[in-house]
Design a protein with these regions (language model features):
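Aromatic "clamp/platform" in nucleotide-sugar-dependent glycosyltransferases that forms part
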Residues: 233, 252
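N-terminal strand-loop element at the rim of the active site
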Residues: 7-66, 144
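Short hydrophobic beta-strand element within catalytic cores of glycosyltransferases
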Residues: 269-272
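A charged, aromatic-enriched C-terminal amphipathic alpha-helix characteristic of glycosyltransferases
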Residues: 163, 309-340
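Carbohydrate-associated surface elements
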Residues: 140, 158
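A conserved mid-protein helix/loop that constitutes part of the nucleotide-sugar donor-binding site
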Residues: 15-23, 171, 178-194, 204, ...
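Short His-centered aromatic/hydrophobic patch
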Residues: 85-91, 109
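Conserved acidic donor-binding segment of nucleotide-sugar-dependent glycosyltransferases
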Residues: 274, 284-296, 303-309
Length: 344
């Protein structure tokens, strides 16, 4: 039985990456028969996403960088067969901590290659070749890392949503994520205003929390929108997916976009800025991609899909695309191939 250690920074913060860590840990345990431990390395608060009882999740208090590295060295002494991490800075430290050990290091890059500062990119350029494998989530990142890595693989996130009884689709547009400048919800609000869809009974719900909330609320008021509202973050988005007709993804950077894939699986029609992740997920649906920052085009696309003909054939095609590429049983087999590959 292979022993796999997942290193997570802070499982209490929610978000797509932590959900993927939980889902992969469960898949490794239940499908691959691995002995899995998930280390909550920099938080002693409970995980947002529940883990089964047979997957231990040891907690560690938030600590200095030096103490964190010492923790990684202690994990090294346990000699797992594989260790995997998911954030760039953590990836760098994990590779260094396990260097020259018998443990195979697999780092998953959840940030687009051009996201970080030059200093972090330089460290990554030096350290990532020392990892056993690097996993990326879209084709553009794959092309970038192939230039200097001998073992880089495209393995997307597994995508699932709870099954709910079908509901009548509402005149509802949703946008989901942390309320930060990077997620760029200002463009979603401006596109809603430019589209004029509120006068036809359409609503925009922005679901999330973060420091941009006051500015976003101010923009809604400034533009005179009465059917556009902000809602608190929610762990389970299934009920929103079941009701919504359209999804807006306006992030400046996305290496994958779990929300986009989950919404498509639920039959929500997406409109997304063409950053790396959405471009990969929607590669068979280019008409749903909009040039970054083009709010006029975003508004026009909203009107087009809000007023289009029966969307059920499109919804079925969107679901089928996600099921055929990102279903857990497909993704876990790609991981099985990686775990069973000869060690470097």
């Amino acid at each position: 039985m292979k022993r796999v250690t997942f290193v997570a920074a802070d499982l209490s913060t929610g978000g797509g990456v932590n959900k993927v860590i939980r889902d992969l840990a469960v898949l490794f345990k239940q499908t691959l028969g691995a002995d899995v431990t998930v280390v909550n390395a920099r938080s002693d608060r409970p995980s947002t996403y529940r883990f089964p009882s047979d997957v231990p999740v040891p907690q560690h208090r938030r600590q200095s960088l030096l103490s964190y590295f010492r923790l990684l060295l202690r994990l090294r002494k346990a000699s797992p067969d594989f260790v995997t991490s998911s954030w760039t800075q953590d990836n760098i430290l994990v590779v260094l901590a396990f260097l020259f050990s018998r443990t195979k290091t697999i780092v998953v890059e959840h940030s687009s290659w051009h996201f970080h500062s030059w200093a972090i990119r330089l460290l990554r350029r030096i350290v990532y070749p020392l990892a056993s494998s690097v996993v990326v989530l879209n084709r553009r990142d794959l092309d970038h890392y192939r230039a200097y890595l001998s073992d880089v693989r495209l393995i997307p996130d597994p995508v699932t949503v709870p099954s709910l009884p079908p509901e009548q689709r509402e005149k509802l547009i949703i946008a989901v994520g942390h309320l930060s400048p990077l997620k760029n919800f200002e463009d979603a609000i401006r596109a809603m205003a430019m589209s004029g869809l509120e006068k036809d009974g359409w609503s925009l719900a922005i679901i999330g929390s973060g420091r941009s909330e006051p500015d976003l609320r101010g923009l809604v008021e400034e533009l005179g929108l009465t059917r556009t509202r902000l809602h608190p973050s929610q762990v389970d988005l299934a009920s929103w997916y079941a009701r919504a007709s359209l999804l807006l993804v306006t992030s400046r950077l996305e290496s994958f976009s779990l929300v986009l894939a989950e919404a498509m699986l639920s039959g929500v029609v997406p409109i997304a800025y063409a950053s790396d992740g959405p471009s990969f997920i929607l590669e068979d649906f280019p008409e749903h991609l909009v040039k970054l920052g083009d709010v006029d085009a975003l508004a026009r696309r909203l009107v087009r899909f809000a007023s289009g003909p029966d969307a059920e054939p499109l919804r079925r095609a969107l679901r089928a695309s996600i099921q055929s590429r990102f279903a857990p049983d497909i993704v876990v087999e790609q991981w099985r191939e990686l775990l069973e590959a000869p060690c470097r």
